[in-house]
Amino acid sequence: MCKPTLKVFSLTIILNKTTAYLFGLLIFMIASISYGHGTDSPIVIKTVDWQTEQIGEIRSYFSKEVKIQRVEGKKCVTGALLNFYVRDSYAFDIDELVQVEVEFDLGKSSAEIILQYDKNGNPENTKRLALPQNGKHRWYRHTFMLERARFSGRHIGNEFGGSLFSTPGVFVNGDFYIAGADNAQITVCDITLKRSNTSPQPTAYGDLFLKLLDENGSQVPGRVGLYDTTGRMPQPGKEAVLFKYVDEEFTNVVILNSSSITWPVRTRKAFYIDGSYHAKLPVGRYQIVVAKGIEYRTLHKNFSIEADKKTSLTMNLSRWVNMPAKGWYSGDVHIHTSRSNNQDNLRIRLHAHAEDLNVSNLLQMGDNKAFYFQQYSWGKTAQYGDAPYTLVPGQEDPRTGERGHTIQLNINEPVRQPERYYLYHQVFDQIRQQGGVTGYAHVNDLTWGLGSLTGLALDVPFGLVDFVEVLQLGRASTSPWFDFLNLGYKLSPAAGTDFPADVVGAVRSYVQTGEEFSVQRWFDGLKAGRTFVTNGPMLEFTVNGKSMGSEVYVRSGDLLEIKATATINPEIANLERIQLFRQGEMLA
């Protein structure tokens, strides 16, 4: 496996008069540049009454304007993102070239078209088309060639840049989708599919029995990739763990390009198991990959399945670093998944345990009309799980494009004021009265993140903000955070995946709780600044013997002794350098 280079470690010291604030706190790998989802509308999922002999259903995501209309006798569908489900009777779980001929209405379509599909887990699954703009013809037909199309309706995934959302496939569960670039509308009036009928047809099967054990010999959940010699992952069996993507349950998890630095194969499909797994597989050679968060070594092994025979595998997981043993516990401050009963608790906690994520903040998302990803209960009684894996409800609300998206953690009950929706400070005040922790999501200096910068400028000077989410989708944005630190404001950094926009815990906040772990100590540490954010590397950092989150009082000319140690799983990356920043400028 080729090791990617660790691009940046960043430590920050903010000197304010005679106080040195230790916001060293940031350590990250830049895997790719991605953008936030950038819409304040809820995740609108609308089933459209538009079918053909081969297309059974269309769903429109993130678009309230989707509509059906007759144009010159043609039945056309218009929307920003149209997700197509192929009838199972025509094609299901295949692996072959498929031609998709699409007719566009040029008068009502974006100049650039994007088609994305499940290329049997291959990340190179995006087709782009520039529509002609000469105005001579209204109708335009184009044939997309989909190599290794799967059509299993099991989560598309992957990324492309755009102002609406960074990873549209993450929210899209279907066979393929067609979208206009930058959330522009498209109009589709006809689609015809033509199969090559070259998919391999297995004739014999064997049984796989798999167990995952941790360093103590205990059976533990984990993430599993299982691939044949072509890189294809067979559909997970019934024993795979179900989890929700927006409104549907799936077993497949998609590992985004921005999170793939810790995944040693190109295929981006995987699934979760509770520690044991049995499935029937076609005869042949396979590679298995097993991961359990970023503190464990990733395992991979080749094996064979023989006809009518049993193959048993035991994968022994081990840590390359043990952060809890050092008093540091991980958390994801930004997860969207609904909970309605204890069965949901069991499922979600198992998901977090499989990623070795200690604190999972499940955010009920709101706008000025309603809440989404609803939580069935609040407060300490709604916190589920024994240490060290706990689910904690919170909210992402208020959230607007003008003032940004806010996050409220460790709250006793949601705070919602539709009639005063832009008065964020009133929400922060009420959250503080509950003992909650307040912050801003998606804090970056790109595109729609400007809304968060406006909100921060209004709320930080009044001491209403505890943290800023600076690491997401494999990209850290330090400039806005540095600006506030340089002015003397203490703001903790935080990391959140915005699941389902990324694998839970792909980026995470580590908080120092000391020898004893509790949920309250974790949130106290986050608020106090005893934290760093990462998507793989680990950090130790002191100034004059004081650790992260401390204040060091110095005089002009005093000598500062700075000690920093950065480590990274040697199996996945090479350490290149450590950077030290002061007042936003690199010192070393």
Language model features by range: what are they?
Residues 37-91:
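Glycan-recognition and processing domains
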Residues 103-109, 147-149, 567:
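Solvent-exposed strand-to-loop "edge" motifs in beta-rich extracellular domains
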Residues 108-119, 574-576:
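Beta-strand acidic-aromatic groove motif in beta-rich domains, primarily in extracellular
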Residues 122-167:
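Extracellular carbohydrate recognition and processing domains
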Residues 176-184:
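Short beta-strand-plus-loop segments that form exposed binding edges in beta-rich domains
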Residues 194-207, 213-217:
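Beta-strand-rich domain onsets/edges
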Residues 272, 293, 299, 324-503, ...:
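Catalytic cores of extracellular degradative/oxidative enzymes
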